[in-house]
Amino acid sequence: MLVQGNRPRQLHWYHAGPMLFGDWGTSRLYVLGLCFFHAQHSSLWFMLAMSALLIGVGWAYSIICRLYPDGGGVYSSARHKSQSLAVFGALLLGADYVVTAALSALDAFHYVDLPFLSPAVWAALSIAVLGILNIFGPTKAGAAALVAAVLTVIFSSVIGFAAVPSLAHSKITALSGSPTSWWSQFTGIILAISGVEAVANMTGIMVEPVEKTARRAIWPVLIEIVVLNLILTLAMSAMPNSAFTENLSEEIIHTMEEEKTPEEEKPYRAHRDDMLKVLASHYVGETFAKVAAVVFALLLLSAVNTAVTDLVSIQYMMARDHELPNMFAGLNKWGMPFVPLVISVLVPLFTVLLVPDVGHLADLYAIGVVGAVAVNLGSCVTTLGLPLKTWERTAMSVLAVLMLAIWFTIAYEKPHALAFAGAIVAVGLTTRWLTHQRKVREVISGTVATIGGTVTSIGQLIEQAGSAGPVENTTHQVRFLVATQGSPKLVQFALDQAKSFHAEVLFLFVRHIAVPMLGPAHRPNIANDPDAQKAAEQIKQMGEAAGVPVRFLYTVADNISETIVDFAVTYGVSQVIIGTSKRGTLWRTMKGDVIQGVAQHLPERTQLLIHA
């Protein structure tokens, strides 16, 4: 029997909120400095305008989460309009993730000033190390990211509270220049919206009702970002200019000399890349600032890791949907798509080496995220079948037009950013076209391989069991669930056990994938999994020989233990049988112990039998 591999909905708002902050809130670490650099003592007006936009975008994404409870990211929502539009939006989001990884890594090493190498080289090395770790598909990285996010909120709040007595002394100047220049400066800090797509991608695993969970996750994070950004902007404006140019590192002095920064602009350029660190030092103390800088750097590095895995996920999902070659969907033994991982590491790595400047990376950053958000909003408001109220559709349409205006402004004023995003989109669309052409040629020439004997047998199993979905235990027959990838000893042991109890055996084959799924779960396709086909045929033959009724369940999941428990509960089994793992200490360290995870969450009425 072939069943849908739905992911368990276990993500509560108090889990999703810190995860969202880890993506969305990270931008504070470079947006504040960029705002002060571009707008100087007029920064407050631009931050107020950005706060209004953040509130609007946050509200819009709470609506998107309601509309798409199984995944509302740009790739998922745009597919309702056009698959080509979905691919275009996904590639823009991919460009965003490339620069997220490069910029976050670079800024991390501006906050912690390490010796011997430049921040760009340290950033490249950190991306490479994270890439190596991701070969093993670590599942515990999320917990570390949550800790870093919570600590960042605490440290940022301490800085904000310490600065409150000085806010009355903030030097706020009127806007100078023309409205055109104001608009240009505003688009320079638009990357503050980056990370909002994360919440839409989480809806597929959110606790129902998804609308309520998403709303509770979004609004506390949004309020924290808006309020603290405004307080910290006032805190920047309250500091004397001399405080920004004290005790500068040799590297910053050298950089400003190379850039020929005018003397009057040095206070605004000096800490563009580590503004929160200098605020911590000025308002709290040097020791606190050093500790805070490490925490901020860890959050930035966790953002690098998230961007890399999300970039892998985009490529994997497109390959799964036959938009990229099949090799992009190939998993290593750790459940990680290897080819997408290599690309997701090398592209940001070379980006940060070729563009070793936070300001220039910020230019590249903005065009990707703004484009992805514009496509997502535009897809929603133009899909007339969606249950949107008139005022909701109107407000989201205004936001979509605004995002498009910002996108075209960036494309016009920063042609290098357009060229960067265009190159990524062009490579992606070309690869997609070649993939489609190859499939067409295969069909025409008759080279598409027909699924033979093994899959025929699986087809018989499917016909006997019916279509996907849990089979109700109407006969109250005893059921065992066996989690296996085809171990003959474990299969035979389970059949012997079942024969003694006159039980039916459900054999569960879990194909592990170690990347987040940025969209609704698709029906697992066993036709693309030769190992599962072989296991299904072997189990069918052994079951017939033993005279025991068997069913074969196949799914793809990112958490093996949770999936086993979910199937055990869904199918009402009385016993779960698992073999001892041959995987070593490294697997358990990176991913956790499967048996321990099952034992902790299995209902008391269900026995767990471990076969050595």
Predicted features along the sequence, with ranges:
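TM-loop-TM module centered on a large, flexible mid-protein loop between adjacent transmembrane helices
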Residues: 73, 217-303, 327-352
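Helix-loop-helix junctions that connect adjacent transmembrane segments
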Residues: 146-201, 207, 223, 235-261, ...
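Extracellular loop-to-transmembrane helix junctions
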Residues: 32-90, 99, 103-127, 222-225
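Membrane-interface "cap" regions at the ends of multi-pass membrane proteins
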Residues: 1-31, 76-78, 84-87, 181-186
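Loop-to-transmembrane helix boundary motifs in multi-pass membrane proteins
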Residues: 84-86, 120-125, 207-228, 316-353, ...
